[in-house]
Amino acid sequence: MRNTTKLVVHVVDAQYLMPRDGQGSASPFVEVDFLNQLSKTRTVPKSLNPVWNQKLYFDYDQSVINQHNQHIEVSVYHERRPIPGRSFLGRVKISLCNIVYKDDQVYQRFTLEKKWLLSSVKGEIGLKFYISSSEEDQTFPLPSKPYTSPTQASASGTEEDTADSETEDSLKSFASAEEEDLADSVSECVEGKKSEEVKEPVQKLHRQEVFARPAPMQSIRLRSRENPHEAQKPMSRGANQLHPQNPNHLQSYGDTDLDDFKVKDMNLDLGERWPNPNAGERFTGTYDLVEQMFYLYVRVVKAKELPPGSITGGCDPYVEVKLGNYKGRTKIFDRKTTIPEWNQVFAFTKERIQSSVLEVFVKDKETLGRDDILGKVVFDLNEIPTRVPPNSPLAPQWYRLEDWRGEGKVVRGEIMLAVWMGTQADEAFPEAWHADSASVHGEGVFNIRSKVYVSPKLWYLRVNVIEAQDMIPSDRNRLPDVFVKASVGMQTLKTSICSIKTTNPLWKEDLVFVVAEPFEEQLVISVEDRVHTSKDEVIGKITLPMNVFEKRLDHRPVHSRWFNLDKYGTGVLEPDARRKEHKFSSRIHLRICLEGGYHVMDESTMYISDTRPTARQLWKQPVGMLEIGILGANGLVPMKLKDGRGSTNAYCVAKYGQKWVRTRTILDTLSPRWNEQYTWEVYDPCTVITLGVFDNSHLGSAQSGTADSRDARIGKVRIRLSTLEAHKIYTHSFPLLVLQPHGLKKTGDLQISVRFTTLSLANIIYNYGHPLLPKMHYLFPFTVNQVDGLRYQAMNIVSTRLGRAEPPLRKEVVEYMLDVDSHLWSMRRSKANFFRIMSLLSGYFLVGKWLEDVCNWRYPVTSVLVNVLFFILVMYPELILPTMFLYMFFIGLWNFRSRPRHPPHMDMKLSWAEAVGPDELDEEFDTFPTSRSQELVRLRYDRLRSVAGRIQTVVGDIAAQGERIQSLLSWRDPRATSLFILFCLAASVVLYAMPFKAIALASGLYYLRHPKFRSKLPSLPSNFFKRLPSSTDSLL
């Protein structure tokens, strides 16, 4: 069977190549090597900036390709003439993990690299590469000759395209009927000096026949299930408050065991209980980080030949599975169905099995009276087989129905069932109906299942507003004050008002938005006139769809475009009869693109879990695998009342990168056991995984709350991957802490197991020497205000999209996991940060105190040794740096014994949560803007003024010291400056005449002199410095 999937390498152009022909030029061609398949372009004679615009095709079979270990090698050569031969000009290696489909292709420029150490290489090459399986791209002529030499290969037949269809289509998608001429002119300008496109067949070195059809590339997309016209609701900037009904708050920690707030080692042997066929390979089994839990699975497939009901004569069949006191029912079919198919799975935990037999009843739903029993099937639990993956699924079988009275009489009808004993690793586990959730009905059944979510793919939309023409206001007697307003969904940004009142304003300002795939919103551009401080008049408006904007991966310039403005705001792609009424229209000049070289941050940089740019073409290879086993929780606090007692319906959410996971909800227990394991690819070890525990309030019952109820937060755990040792399993119990308006509260413990497996140590070391974020964040950074605003909008989009999944990951959960309120003011956080700085500086303070003790000869032996060491270092200064680094090396080895054994956790002392006052907590949980009384706000403002006054004094003292240094040579104090410059002259003569070692030795011995030779008065330099003037005298 012939493989129809092709890898297309579109060689566009090159720039600034190295001359090779001895006349300051070169005749370059490109050769591409992909898995021993060679193909080359034509030769462009006498050009250092050649343009090929040629496509090369290669067979692509994903079933035999390892994307992480194989590359495409693109080499540039100079063709020597008249003597056949070639000279190397540079090459580029492209990893297969960066390959995308044709719809996502983007033009990229690569810097040419050397092949050998002494090679002389410079220049760049422009390429597009993608995978295509369409018939249009497969129609190319077959080669008539095998690959021989560059001269012969360049003479092979090619097929020419009429135009660059991508650029043409993207431009014409903007243009309306009146703008076709403009689109054509812009298309010609974009093509520039590009030659006609050439499609070149593959010249194979080794021919292979592939009989297996290649598997398609896997991509995960979050599909929209919501009405696209529904408006997004912005996030509330206020802090979320949690008020459980039975709070046991920790007001004082004097009598509390502080060990309850520390990480505890569980010491569980998790991997030994699971069958592991790949024990000798690099990766272990799929479920080797959790405890094994056995379940009795019953799969009800379908039934046939069912008898009619005894009352109505018809049949509305359904199946009831009974095991002890647990009962589960399938959906009901109507009478029109002769062979009902349910295909439902029921799961009963082995720990709660209370019977030795399993009964499966087939019943007929009756409108009046009891349901009629058509028959049953009975299974002895001792005879049920056990099945654990990777064993194949158990095939269902047909069973004859027996009389439900137990007489052994066979009745009419058969039912197809599969019954087996399995574990949570079974494929049927996520979608099965669980016996412990029998009290959940309606939509609540879907809200308790475990699910995996994917964050939407976020882009930065950059709108560069350049200028506008013919801005005619409604009042022709005045010149307009013009500004531009751009909107995308709920995001709205404005440019400044043009500094000059004119009908042809100029701005050159950038407006940046956050948009998500699939693109649902449109960009609305309106030009408005500031008539009055409270009145703006729209001059023109235009609506543009997102999918027509150009995507760029670097800082290359994007082509700008003029757009006609419409008074009614009609888009350029939407013909409207009203547009024909106006023969004259204003115009605006815009440059719009989707930025793929940035990472769109939806979480704080301190807790970032993903640093990859938006464009998949720029992703690096993964450096490791992160495996998390969510075992369970212990000692959870009751979050609601049920039947007069406390109850908690807990589930756990984990977020790392773009992948979110949610465990199933365990009902009515304070010690839930999930035992679910998940895996993530790691692209940067300096990232953080976040796990949160919540109480489910959407179970479809009156006791569980209404649709407007919020899932209460129970606690959160963060783990930084760089703090974990590779290939080691960490099994710990982490305390869950929640800060509430009444104080800090421990809500339980989360038990998890973590393993970080490295794929390549060299790649991890490589990451430590490179920036955390993509290079565009440093070459063209956003301002601080832009970063905060864009992060807020990104969190809004992520919470909205995940809230539309089924079951939804609710807004309050996403906000808590992304720390939406981390930027709000808090006196507690300010104190915590201040003491963090003091703790950081405490080491320097200890060194200063130790040095003071040495100078005062408080410990004579130490002082003598320091003097001797100082003398040696002065006489042999080349030993200073080696001694310092060797000292740090031995300190690091010494500290290895006391290295941290546990991952970091939420520290209540570091967070300053153990001594915070109730008023400060109430202030932290206040909304933004405030919702407290005026008197309370006044008291807090006075307190903030007192704190700011102390900070103001410290900052003023620091500024005064710096100004005194500046005044040394400023002649603000003529006598002080005269003395200082005379001292500098004398010092220069002395330093020139005397050896440096003698001066350093004399200065050091003077500093370390005995207290007998010291005075308690300040030194002469200190007295002189404190007398210098500063700008404090000039302050009001």
Curated annotation (Swiss-Prot):
One of its GO terms (molecular function) is metal ion binding. Its cofactor is Ca(2+). Residues 158-168 have a biased composition (Acidic residues). It comes from the Eukaryota. Residues 190-204 have a biased composition (Basic and acidic residues). It holds the Pfam family PRT_C. It is a multi-pass membrane protein. InterPro entries: C2_dom, C2_domain_sf, C2B_MCTP_PRT_plant, C2C_MCTP_PRT_plant, C2D_MCTP_PRT_plant, MCTP_C, QUIRKY-like. GO terms for cellular component: plasma membrane. Residues 137-204, 225-246 are annotated as: Disordered. Ca(2+) 1 binds at D316, D364, E366. PANTHER family: MULTIPLE C2 DOMAIN AND TRANSMEMBRANE REGION PROTEIN 2 (PTHR31425:SF24), PHOSPHORIBOSYLANTHRANILATE TRANSFERASE ISOFORM 1 (PTHR31425). This is Multiple C2 domain and transmembrane region protein 2. The lineage of its organism: Eukaryota, Viridiplantae, Streptophyta, Embryophyta, Tracheophyta. The gene is MCTP2.
